[in-house]
Amino acid sequence: MRSPAKTMPSMSPSSVSTEKSPPPSDTSMAIVAFDNSTTHFSSSPSPPHSLDHSSESEKEDAKSKPESRRNKNPGKVEETPSPIVVVHNHNRSVKEVVPTRKSARVGSGRSSGQRSGAVSAILRRSRREEVVKFSALGFRLSEVVLALISFSIMAADKTKGWSGDSFDRYKEYRFCLSVNVVAFVYSSFQACDLAYHLVKEKHLISHHLRPLFEFIIDQVLAYLLMSASTAAVTRVDDWVSNWGKDEFTEMASASIAMSFLAFLAFAFSSLISGYNLFNQGSL
């Protein structure tokens, strides 16, 4: 006997598809995962727009790196003494220009200081030379006056009468008179030369040996005046000790005193002559 066939319940196609098909959310996720894996391991070359985008991003990164490096230590730029320093390829040239300018300024200050020092030294030297010139002229005039008074008094030292006497009888008095006459002539010429030099800025007789000649003559006349005055004083003392004081001895003593003062004037003139000898350009 045949058993009756069992009839299966009929199902609509829509119901079958809904029961057996996976949920749509899972299917979308699987597709997304598959797509990502395929794109990740794909050996096909990337599209050109992606390369351009990557190269542009690399350029931007390369530009941003030095800027970030500069901004890491901003204090270093501020610590530099020169405000002109900029981080470029010509940074060395800028750094080299700044110290040269500073050194030029410092050098100009030193040069100006040296110029002012030289000017002040020249002014001091000119003033010293003027003082020396006027001092020399003053001593020369003193020599003229003192030598003139000395030999004038000695030449007039004469007495009349049976006990009369005269200076020309004693060699000491004659020696003193002669030395004072020579001193008067020499000092008169030197006084005229100094006065002419102060007015015209030149000497009556210009010679390279003139300072040496003046120094030697001043020294010689100073020693001669000293020796003549000493010899005349000895004769006066001998006369007074034997005969006592009178008009003759008093006039001789006055002449000797003027001669001694003339010696002092020549001594100072010899010092000035020595200064002029070792400073040829002063007078």
Curated annotation (Swiss-Prot):
This is CASP-like protein 4A3. Belongs to the Casparian strip membrane proteins (CASP) family. Residues 50-79 have a biased composition (Basic and acidic residues). One of its GO terms (cellular component) is plasma membrane. Residues 1-86 are annotated as: Disordered. It comes from Arabidopsis thaliana (Mouse-ear cress). The lineage of its organism: Eukaryota, Viridiplantae, Streptophyta, Embryophyta, Tracheophyta. The chain crosses the membrane at residues 136-156, 175-195, 213-233, 252-272. Keywords: Cell membrane, Membrane, Transmembrane, Transmembrane helix. Homodimer and heterodimers. It is a multi-pass membrane protein.
